[in-house]
Amino acid sequence: MNQWLAWQISGLGPSQGQLVWFLAFHEGAHGEKPGPSIIARYQNEVERLRSVLETHLASAPGGYVALGHLTIADLAILPWLKLSALAGPALKPFDQYPAVDAYIKKLDALPEVQAAYKKAVPPPQ
């Protein structure tokens, strides 16, 4: 479980956060568009990380990242997967990652996750 929590906090979160920053906010904050190599760097890394997750989930017991059941690692990963919508077409749609897509749908359907969504401001799409 700790491995997947570390994967999110050191990989997916920072890489996707940087991608979204450069796509959505950099120009407004700095008055210039980011170079294409910057976008490509983070785009490629996020897609690589999604592939790692896809490979793992395809054979993970119970369809969760660790221990065969819901853990804090799943709850740390899910918001970043959901927030990838902010990157728009810069990232492949989740239907190209069927195990990740099923994982998102599975977690979204959990009563605990639904309860958290009701408290979110604004609610996630």
Segments from the language model and where they lie:
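C-terminal helix/juxtamembrane-tail motif
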Residues: 113-125
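Hydrophobic, well-structured mid-protein blocks that either form specific transmembrane helices
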Residues: 1
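GST-like fold's C-terminal all-alpha helical module
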Residues: 4, 8-106
